[in-house]
Design a protein with these regions (language model features):
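GHKL/Bergerat-fold ATPase module in large chromosome/replication-associated machines
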Residues: 126-129, 147-166, 186-190, 195-623
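GHKL (Bergerat-fold) ATPase N-terminal catalytic module, capturing the glycine-rich phosphate-binding loop
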Residues: 1-194, 617, 621
Length: 623
């Protein structure tokens, strides 16, 4: 029977159902990644209680104690802060998602405004927010006991909870204001009641900068540092560098002090690590504290992507931690912090280039390829490097400005380009090309990393509005033979000589050169690469899918060949060319050609090596 569209659907409302015991289990075991997290959460609660009491009593300072009891298998956190009333304990301690600190912050402002002073926006110096920190203790404990007396209150309260759903409230014998939280540890976490070094490590990891002394097992010495040099109103640079080295266990190449008040507050220091990053995918990791409580020592995305070599520690009071307090929320405040940090880094490095050039060059040299590779995608970084980054050239290390100044085109042979910049991307030809360019006023830039070629082109395009032609240092490039090699007209060798040199698979030319070299050889990098792939294919070491991609690439853009120039000004070459390929001098010439190719870094085929042996025998017979 068809349904009548006019028939009303039956509906009913049902409430969400929550398995409280299950939620507590999740809160205690799955929300946090490390078992020492409860140390952070309970120290945070103690800190907030003390800060709230300080707001009411200007003569009060406050103290946190952490006590271990191996016999009772307990770990206790004690503060002399504002404490809890019986009603507050009942309303807040056992309610997930509602915390006193969070409510105070919410009352401070319900409207986000990045320009609002932090004390108004977030409840001042309070850290807590989510009302879930106490439940992290179930990660270590199967029972929690809280005893508290409200500041200026009359009756202390005792709050006890296990892993189930029931909470027991009663009166307590506590006589002084403050709170104690005792964890009755699970057997597999008994080490937290016995190992003082383990607990102190957790205190230092999370609470080293809290402005409240924390004492372990009633020790007279506090466990936390409290005030680091980089948090001082006027930091001492030497002290900052010394403490950075101690905190991170490595000596900084340079320290970047950060002190920003608006639009967001940032305080701390970054430093240039001596550790070279292996690639460009590595991210800088920064230790971050929020209102002095360390969130993590591995916060990513705070510094520009081009600076993976930066490390440091920053106090970011305006940022919001994630619910597990192990990272920062990526929001408008976070973006504003990143922009401010980026501006500070650029400004610091720019100041170094002008006032401490030797220090800047040391940093630039140490992280050379990271700077060069990242500058391709960052215009501000390219501007920073344009007057300081030194390319390796045939005339020594030169900046892009110096390269351009030496590369003015010869108007007699160049009708369109105002500048001609020569470059070489093959390390094997570096010394060989340096010989040719030693007599030229123009340098050859050795872009031995692929990104350096792109960086060179980008910088040249931004440096001048005049026409700049970037050319490979190769005989196939316009005017290379005439301008650099000093060759007269270059002609193709005859078919007879091409056949004679066929095993070398090279283009053979004849020209008159002032060079004393009988043979000039130039390696085509793409040709050499194609032959490497051919060898892999023949040995069955190239996956078929990859092979198809390679074939398609070289079909679209043929590899070309290596190039040989026979110097007709050289007496031996001239006589060999006159006598022809049947004369023993042809064998001598082929040996010279193979030697020139080898010097330039070319791969010599096995058949050519066999012919070389035959040539030696032919020469011996002729003698």
């Amino acid at each position: 029977m068809p349904l009548d569209s006019a028939t009303p659907h039956k509906a009913k409302r049902i409430p969400f159902k929550v398995d409280i015991a299950g939620v507590i289990e999740i809160m205690g075991t799955s929300l946090y990644s490390h078992p020492n997290t409860p140390i952070r959460e309970l120290l945070q609660n103690a800190h907030d209680a003390i800060m709230r009491r300080r707001a009411r009593d200007l003569t009060y300072h406050g103290r946190i104690d952490v006590l271990q009891n191996a016999d009772a298998r307990t770990l206790t956190f004690i503060d002399d802060g504002i404490g809890l009333s019986s009603k507050e304990a009942e309303d807040y301690l056992g309610t997930l998602g509602i915390g006193i600190t969070g409510l105070i912050k919410k009352e401070a402002t319900d409207v986000f405004d990045i320009s609002m002073h932090s004390n108004k926006r977030d409840g001042g110096n309070l850290i807590g927010q989510f009302g879930i920190g106490l439940f992290s203790a179930f990660m270590l404990a199967d029972k929690i006991v809280v005893e508290s007396l409200r500041f200026e209150g009359e009756e202390a309260v005792r709050w006890e909870a296990g892993a189930g759903t029931d909470i027991e409230l009663s009166t307590s014998d506590r006589t002084s204001a403050g709170t104690s939280v005792t964890l009755y540890l699970k057997p597999n976490y008994a080490i937290f009641a016995d190992d003082a070094e383990l607990v102190e490590s957790g205190i230092k990891q999370y609470a080293d900068f809290l402005p409240i002394p924390i004492h372990l097992n009633q020790s007279n010495a506090r466990s936390n540092l409290i005030q680091a040099a980089w948090l001082e109103p006027t930091p001492d640079n030497d002290a900052v560098e010394e403490q950075i080295a101690s905190y991170f266990g490595e000596t900084p190449l340079d320290v970047i002090p950060i002190a920003v008040e608006a639009p967001v507050a940032i305080k701390g220091a970054l430093y240039v690590s001596p550790q070279r990053t292996p690639g460009f995918a590595d991210d800088a990791t920064i230790a971050v504290s929020v209102r002095r409580m360390v969130i993590s020592r591995h916060i990513r995305e705070l510094v520009p992507i081009w600076a993976p070599f930066l490390r440091g520690v920053l106090e970011l009071p305006n940022c919001s931690p994630t619910s597990n307090r192990e990272d920062l929320v990526r929001d408008a405040v976070f973006d504003s912090v990143c922009d401010s940090i980026s501006d500070e880094i650029y400004a610091h490095f720019d100041e170094l280039t002008r006032n401490q050039p030797h220090r800047w060059q040391s940093i630039l040299h140490w992280h050379r390829y990271t700077f060069a590779g990242m500058a391709i995608h960052d215009e501000k970084l390219r501007v920073l490097l344009s007057s300081t980054y030194k390319f390796i050239t045939s005339h020594g290390e030169l900046t892009i400005e110096q390269i351009l100044a030496r590369s003015r085109a010869d108007a007699l042979v160049e009708s369109e380009a105002d500048f001609v910049v020569w470059y070489n991307a093959d390390r094997r030809q570096e010394s060989w090309l340096n010989e040719f360019f030693s007599n030229s006023s123009s340098p050859c830039v050795h872009t031995l990393r692929s990104f350096e070629e792109t960086l060179l082109a980008s910088m040249l395009g931004e440096l001048t509005d005049e026409q700049v032609d970037l050319r490979p240092a190769s005989p196939s490039s316009s005017n290379f033979c005439e301008s650099i090699l000093g060759l007269d007209e270059r002609i193709d060798a005859s078919d007879e000589w091409h056949t004679f040199f066929d095993s070398l698979d090279s283009n053979i030319f004849i020209a008159s050169s002032p060079s004393k070299q009988p043979v000039l050889a130039f390696v085509n990098e793409r040709y050499e690469l194609s032959k490497t792939f051919d060898d892999l294919r023949e040995n069955g070491e190239l996956p078929k899918g990859f092979q198809r991609l390679i074939d398609q690439h070289f079909q679209r853009s043929p590899a070309g060949k290596n190039e040989i120039i026979l110097n007709s000004e050289h007496r031996l070459v001239r006589r060999a060319l006159e006598q022809g390929t049947a004369h023993p001098l042809a064998s001598v010439l082929r040996i010279l050609v193979i030697a020139a190719l080898s010097k330039a870094g070319a791969r010599i085929k096995s058949i050519a090596q066999e012919l070389q042996s035959e040539d030696l025998e032919s020469i011996a017979d002729a003698l």
